[in-house]
Design a protein with these regions (language model features):
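Exposed, low-structure sequence patches enriched in small/polar residues
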Residues: 1-197
Length: 197
């Protein structure tokens, strides 16, 4: 509900409708996505994801442990700082800002992710991602030599190892939330990029 209406510099007012399936439809196959429309730029934005869980789930694909593969695509507009938000970037409360954020970019992303979690809270995530970004608003990309670049493209592979002994979480429809912070979480991650892909 808190993402139905929001605002940013490019969209001005933004309307969004989201949907996702639960294990009530299928205990292995999960779909989720959204469609959003910006009143100022008159562009549709979207995200769609298909996730297959090799383990039977009671309600959500986020339930522990995970053994799943997901494929997603997304086209949207965002500020560079939106990638660091702990919540959804379309949360209506993120629209309340003390100053105008007008450096934004349209981005198109394709993602394949595999997650495997062991009973001892050790997990492995492997991911392939391709992103194209086009600056908008007052944002621009320039080479060291001063040439304006119309878009940035990055293709990358990430391998992440995570160990969270004693971790307890609450699973919501979209994500997990830790309920205890008494134990350490160890994460080792490596990302490598591919040139000219």
């Amino acid at each position: 509900v808190n993402t139905v209406v929001s605002s940013n510099f490019i969209d001005k007012v933004r309307f969004r409708a989201s949907a996702q399936t639960t294990a009530n439809l299928s205990p292995h196959l999960f779909l989720k996505g959204y469609a959003a429309y910006g009143v100022r730029d008159k562009k549709w934005k979207y995200e769609g994801e298909v996730e297959y869980s090799f383990l039977k789930k009671q309600y959500s694909p986020e339930e522990f442990p995970r053994n799943s593969i997901a494929i997603s695509t997304r086209y949207d507009v965002m500020a560079p700082s939106d990638a660091m938000l702990p919540t959804d970037k379309d949360n209506v409360f993120t629209s309340l800002k003390t100053q105008t954020i007008d450096q934004m970019s349209y981005f198109r992303q394709y993602n394949i992710r595999y997650v495997y979690e062991f009973d001892n809270h050790f997990g492995i995530t492997a991911q392939l991602r391709h992103i194209t970004q086009n600056p908008t608003g007052t944002l621009f990309y320039r080479t060291v030599g001063g040439q304006i670049v119309p878009e940035l493209t990055q293709s990358e592979a990430t391998l992440s190892l995570r160990y969270a002994p004693g971790e307890k979480v609450v699973v919501t429809k979209q994500r997990r939330h830790p309920v205890n912070h008494n134990y350490p979480i160890y994460t080792l991650m490596h990302t490598t990029g591919f040139k000219d892909v």
